Amino acid sequence: TDPYSPTVRIKEFKQMVQALHRAGIRVILDVVYNHTFDIKNSNFQRVNPDYYYRKTADGKYSDGSGCGNETASEKALMREYMLESVKYWVNEYHIDGFRFDLMGVHDIVTMNDIRAAVDQIDPSIYIYGEGWSAGSCAYPTDKLAMKANTRQLNGIGAFCDDMRDALRGPFSDDHKGGFLAGMPDMEESLKFGIVGAISHPQIDMMRVNYSKEAWTNSPTQMVSYVSCHDDLCLTARLRSSIPGITEDELIRLDLLAQTAVLTSQGVPFILCGEEMLRDKKGVHNSFKSPDSINHLDWNNLKRYPQVFDYYSGLIALRKSHPAFRLANADLVRKHLSFLDAPKGVVAF
């Protein structure tokens, strides 16, 4: 191997994808089209100054990405760049799906064009993303691929922060808990996630934490999760929001959280390593942290075999029973009903 040789890196990446496919594992690529590292030295700016970036009414560069700029996906050449590069990843590297970073910065038309383009190659390719931005965008919100506009996206999913924060607590405050911490009035938000963010007669949308109306056409458009690479991992969030929590309590609440995720009608998403109680030492955003923080401690498999076995059992349960994978909203409304339960309990 030679990390300084581009041809070697390309070859090894292809070999990696091929090996994963042989093992029955599909590969999803995290793509970040919403910003560049800077503007002045970017290839976009050198080729066509200011064309590829959005600007505010007063001529300043807009910063919907929170990284100093935002790209203008609605412009023909930026749209073509996104389309052609996605198709290249599929055709040349055999990528099976794409996770769009800050998808809410991109316009709806471009995202639907990407979906249509990959459908021509392989309709099973899964596309989803973060249905939000990191700041105000210099483009009409109703034309952006925000979570609230997911019903305008064809076959594209979005992360469900409604369910995430109902379980663990709000994004804005690591020390505040949610359903797992026994906080009141989280039931409707959790139920909304369980049905896949569709409209359901047993859910009072006015009591859902963020969304006041359904935002998916199909449960497959909702990604159900409780933590990801951003923010605190689940173990750290539980420690932060529940002072004095014991290890036994932490494990039980961790398993409860993933029970909600893996029995919901959305597409379940689990942060790598959480099946063995991954711990990033309380680092909130570890993208620039060393391996001592981001590594996977495989010794945890020996420390917490019961956690790994429980996760495995949940996955096996989901795969074995179609009731957890209903194909459309009508089937969910027909077959999934919530039972009467006391406050602090959700049963279905």
Annotate the PLM regions.
Residues 1-93, 106-122, 126, 137-138:
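Substrate-binding/active-site clefts of carbohydrate-active enzymes
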Residues 17, 86-90, 115, 119, ...:
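Non-transmembrane alpha-helical segments in soluble domains
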Residues 20, 30, 89, 100, ...:
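Conserved, mostly hydrophobic/aromatic
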Residues 31-41, 102-107, 130-134, 269-280, ...:
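Short, solvent-exposed turn/loop segments enriched in Gly/Ser/Thr/Pro and often Arg
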Residues 73, 99-102, 212-213, 238-252, ...:
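Active-site rim elements
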Residues 115-116, 124-272, 276-277, 287, ...:
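Conserved alpha/beta catalytic core and glycan-binding cleft of carbohydrate-active enzymes
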Residues 287-296:
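Acyl/amide activation-and-transfer machinery of modular secondary-metabolite enzymes
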Residues 297, 301-331:
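Catalytic cores of secreted or luminal carbohydrate-active enzymes
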